[in-house]
Amino acid sequence: MDNPTDTAGKCPVAHGNKPRGPSNRDWWPNQLNVQILHHNSGRADPLGKDFDYAEEFKKLDLDALKKDLHALMTDSQDWWPADFGHYGGLFIRMAWHSAGTYRITDGRGGAGQGQQRFAPLNSWPDNANLDKARRLLWPIKQKYGNRISWADLLILTGNVALESMGFKTFGFAGGRADVWEPEELYWGPEGTWLGDERYSGERQLAEPLGAVQMGLIYVNPEGPNGNPDPVAAARDIRETFARMAMNDEETVALIAGGHTFGKTHGAGDPSFIGAEPEGGAIEDQGLGWKSSFGTGVGKDAITAGLEVTWSQTPTKWSNYFFENLFAYEWELTKSPAGAHQWRAKNAEASIPDAYEPGKKHVPTMLTTDLSLRFDPIYEKISRRFLENPDQFADAFARAWFKLTHRDMGPKVRYLGPEVPAEDLIWQDVIPAVDHPLVDDKDIAELKAKVLATGLTVQELVSTAWASASTFRGSDKRGGANGARIRLAPQKDWEANQPAQLAKVLGVLEGIQKDFNAAQTGAKKISLADLIVLAGAAGVEKAAAAGGNAVSVPLTPGRMDASEAQTDAHSFAPLEPRIDGFRNYVNGKRLQFMKPEEALVDRAQLLTLTGPEMTVLVGGLRVLKAGNPEHGVFTSRPETLTNDFFVNLLDVATQWVPATGKEGVYEGRDRKTGAAKWTGTRVDLIFGSHSQLRAFAEVYGQADAKQKFVKDFVAAWNKVMNADRFDLV
């Protein structure tokens, strides 16, 4: 894997030459950015709102496509020649780097949208010359058109590269629909490529970041900050791979497996390399990193500045990586480009040259390769793989599948004939529906039974929201399906009010048991469905109390996951530390976000628009579905009204910081000074931020009472069904 270091110090923002006035963000850099709620809204989609990628994919002749990809592997082009006559190593790196931006903290990044096509990823130093890989693929993409997305093609090509070199992959699933504009993510605080201002204390990597430097996928292959220390590098590897949801065995398998093929490129000084794609000339047509060193390609190529080939058979699956790693002692040296790398001591030249037949080189390794030998935990795993090649092959196949499919969500989203039959725990498995579902009559009766228990609107709504609002549109995890709110760790999360949650779940489980036992046939209701049903009943009751009769729909079909189907550790990153919808902040608040920023961030993960976020906050506040101390701007709590907006926007109220309470404000009567309300930054942002205030004014108007309830129910239902991919 190439990890170029040649553009350090350059600004990662591509600036145009044409003068322009400053943007709003230039004038007010601390302004809350709500535009992320409207990215990839469909207006930029050239395929139109009616295009169904899943249906198009079904028309794909996958065998024919793979045959064409196999042929491409050895169809070397003069403008970008194939190392060793085979593009396999290049395409593995392309697929790896497409998927490798995934981070478990917020589920963002990954291969699911084909973001490698866009800035900044297309111009990251770590992705140098992958523009050539995608350009090599264009004739095939052009041939198969909309039947294969770029997102799927990048991963499939990596699989075919492995298969063409003798490796048996675990499988492939299609279903990654392309997007048409770059995702606006927080990739770090740095303003220069390869900057590393993301650390504090004893090399504590800031959240939610998953790489050690700006523009890298994981780690610096020369070692931390270029220090060639394999043990120190192992610490960086362990941290960054863990943030991609990989354990130690998967980490070793991925590094060794990927480095069984191909080579890195450091034929000359990085100063010979030109601008990245986004900074290139218009005539370069999106190709960057043009090199003036020699021919600039093939034997003269410069990508990472490192010049390493790991295996005696770099176009064939083998165990040479581990054999070489343990067969030699290693001495520090430098590549022709001046980068730190390692050379085997007293070794014969056994590594083939990529372009000169018969020429051999001494085995070489990266600092991060040696980490697999000198870190004591990695070393044990590596020796086991050395002695058991079949275990290594299986571990790499599974880890590669996880790497390339981690952000796709549940298996119901997988498409194609190569989907593995085996269920894997990281897929957050949910049992298939195996019984008749409740009908409208049952739903009405169950709602009545729920309300007859005496559970309050607040308890019903809070529980349903806690269950569903874990959903992340980024990696399609979380949500109400599976009823994992009753399992560890979710049942113990502070934001979920564990004591109240246990009470509500106990009552609902009793209703579920009685209903299922009373059926003469096989009809059942899952607890997952019943939790959502109970929340709907609570919303209906609250709306009726405000004079609006509404029916909150329920589409049954959720099932209950078991503890055995749940990796509790992997759900820890889904725990809310700041949840603006519930006005919740705990002691482990996110240091890189203000509460209002965390609200927008959570809304984006829930795939909500600005108006949807606004109406949900207003409704949840008056229903007391969260922190009851602040933001409940109503004299009739648990009644679904637009009171939150009416009272927030009341010009007779003056807001002042509360004494001794950071982030809390008091709303006082302008004339008397009497305290009326207390609110948080999240509450007040809807009166302070000009765009959010515009949304709030719509819902605070005298004629908005019915619209508010209608829009709240629609947004509520969207969140309740966010993970129902079976309905799409």
UniProtKB/Swiss-Prot annotation:
| Reactions catalysed, as given in the entry | H2O2 + AH2 = A + 2 H2O; 2 H2O2 = O2 + 2 H2O
Enzymatic class = oxidoreductase
Record site feature (Transition state stabilizer), residues: R93
Q: Where is this cross-link: Tryptophyl-tyrosyl-methioninium (Trp-Tyr) (with M-244)?
A: W96-Y218
**Which residue intervals make up region (Disordered)?**
1-26
Q: Where is this cross-link: Tryptophyl-tyrosyl-methioninium (Tyr-Met) (with W-96)?
A: Y218-M244
Gene3D superfamilies given for it? 1.10.520.10, Peroxidase, domain 2
GO terms under biological process: cellular response to hydrogen peroxide; hydrogen peroxide catabolic process
Picking any one GO molecular function of the record gives: catalase activity
Q: How is the cofactor bound?
A: Binds 1 heme b (iron(II)-protoporphyrin IX) group per dimer.
Pfam families attached to this UniProt entry:
peroxidase (PF00141)
Q: CDD domains of this UniProt entry?
A: catalase_peroxidase_1 (cd00649), catalase_peroxidase_2 (cd08200)
Q: Which PANTHER family match?
A: CATALASE-PEROXIDASE (PTHR30555:SF0), HYDROPEROXIDASE I, BIFUNCTIONAL CATALASE-PEROXIDASE (PTHR30555)
Q: What does this protein do?
A: Bifunctional enzyme with both catalase and broad-spectrum peroxidase activity. Important for stationary phase survival.
HAMAP family, from UniProt? Catal_peroxid
Complex and partners: Homodimer or homotetramer.
Q: Which NCBIfam families match?
A: cat_per_HPI (TIGR00198), PRK15061.1 (NF011635)
Q: What is this protein called?
A: Catalase-peroxidase
Lineage from the top down?
Bacteria, Pseudomonadati, Pseudomonadota, Alphaproteobacteria, Hyphomicrobiales
Question: What gene is this protein a product of?
Answer: katG
